[in-house]
UniProtKB/Swiss-Prot annotation:
This is Cytochrome c6. Heme c binds at C37, C40, H41, M81. Belongs to the cytochrome c family. PetJ subfamily. GO terms for biological process: photosynthesis. Its main location: plastid. Functions as an electron carrier between membrane-bound cytochrome b6-f and photosystem I in oxygenic photosynthesis. The gene is petJ. It comes from Gracilaria tenuistipitata var. liui.
């Protein structure tokens, strides 16, 4: 019985820490997005190419609706979008990707 109780306590601690980390990553992603991306992508829009927004339907249509796709785009850039791979740490880029995907899924 003690072993079962210990197992549930460990699971509870682990899942709460994962949720806190994810929330912190979204906060960090929001800060990085505001500082580096919002000039062109305020509120999920696109000031340069208006049809390629960060809204859920546009991300899906352009096959950019995954963390990997967004991370790749941010790191390497494409067309008018500059590459941020040399300017931002990988962790920061991943936080931005998580933030963008989360915001798009929740309607900005």
């Amino acid at each position: 019985m003690r072993l079962l109780f210990a197992f549930f306590i460990i699971c509870h601690i682990f899942t709460n820490n994962v949720q806190l980390t994810f929330a912190a990553d979204l906060d960090a992603g929001e800060q990085i997005f505001s500082a580096n991306c919002s000039a062109c992508h305020a509120n999920g829009n696109n000031a340069i190419m208006p049809d390629k927004t960060l809204k859920s339907d546009a991300l899906s249509e352009n096959k950019m609706n995954s963390i990997e796709a967004i991370t790749n785009q941010v790191k390497n850039g494409k067309n008018a979008m500059p590459a941020f791979g040399g300017r931002l740490a990988d962790e920061d880029i991943e936080n931005v990707a998580n933030y963008v995907l989360n915001k798009s899924e929740n309607g900005w």
